[in-house]
Amino acid sequence: MASTPEAKVKKQIRKILEEMGAYYAMPIGTGYGNSGVPDFLVCSKGSFIGIEAKANAGKTTALQESHLSRIRGAGGTALVINEQNIDQLKGYLS
C-alpha cells in the first residue's frame, strides 16, 4: 500500500493519529472535491488540525499554502509533515 515516499509518510501519520485517539478524515482529490485541501483533516482534543504530508524535501504548492493559511486564519492549526519532522506530530498531539 505505501509504495511511494509520500504514501509512507501518510501511513506513519495515520498510525500516530490512531494511537493518539484523534479523529481524522482524508479528503479524496477528485473532480468533485477541492484541490489543495490538506491530506488529513483532524480533530484532536477539541482542536482542528490540517496536515499536509510531504516526502523528502517536497514543497507545498501555492494552492496548498492558501488552504493552510485559511485554516490558520480560522483559528485552526496547519502542519506540513515529512520524514524529518514526523516525530514532532506525536508531541504536538500529546
Language-model segment annotations:
Residues 1-94:
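Catalytic phosphate/metal-binding cores of nucleic-acid and nucleotide-processing enzymes, i.e., regions
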